[in-house]
Design a protein with these regions (language model features):
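Hydrophobic face of amphipathic alpha-helices that form TPR/SEL1-like repeat modules
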Residues: 1-2, 29-38, 42, 52, ...
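Short helix-capping/linker turns of helical repeat alpha-solenoids
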Residues: 2-4, 9, 22-26, 38-40, ...
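TPR/TPR-like alpha-solenoid signature
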Residues: 15, 30, 66, 86-87, ...
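Canonical positions in the second alpha-helix
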Residues: 19-20, 55-56, 92
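Short, flexible beta-strand-to-coil junctions
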Residues: 86-97
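Terminal, low-structured helical/coil segments at or just beyond the last alpha-helical repeat
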Residues: 98-141
Length: 141
């Protein structure tokens, strides 16, 4: 990816990330998500990016949680959802990821009272379950 000792080749990097991600490597899934999100070494594919970030997020990769929130906020591969963006940013904040608090403060100002109540309810449900069970119950993907 960075060309350490070899020429930079995003296509080759994508191939290696893909192989490693398919073996369950969390950081490779995060890198794969970025590749799909940005179109680096592969055509942009928001749904595949979300799938890769989801894998990493469910295994407590904090930046993946932040990016999933961003995707819901911007409608990248999903319908824009302030409640889901708030939820994922809150889950990222729980892992002390920079930017999550600012995003939460920003989106709170844009949310209706009903949206905010639903988002808080979803967050509390996730705190009472494993994140995997929470995502299944709330159909978050």
């Amino acid at each position: 990816k960075k060309g350490l000792g070899v020429p930079v080749n995003n296509n080759e990097a994508f191939g290696w990330f893909f192989l490693s991600a398919n073996q369950g490597n969390i950081l490779a899934n995060y890198a794969l998500g970025h590749a799909y999100l940005k179109g680096s070494g592969i055509k942009k594919n928001y749904k595949s990016a979300l799938k890769a970030f989801k894998y990493a997020a469910l295994r407590e990769h904090p930046s993946s949680r932040l990016i999933i929130g961003n995707m819901y906020y911007q409608g990248q591969g999903v319908i824009v959802s302030y409640t889901r963006a708030f939820l994922w940013w809150s889950l990222a904040q729980d892992l002390n990821i920079g930017g999550a608090s600012q995003n939460i403060d920003m989106i709170k100002k844009k949310m209706s009272k009903d949206q905010y109540s639903k988002a808080k309810e979803m967050y509390l449900m996730c705190m009472q379950n494993t994140l995997y069970n929470c995502t299944k119950k709330l159909d978050l993907f």
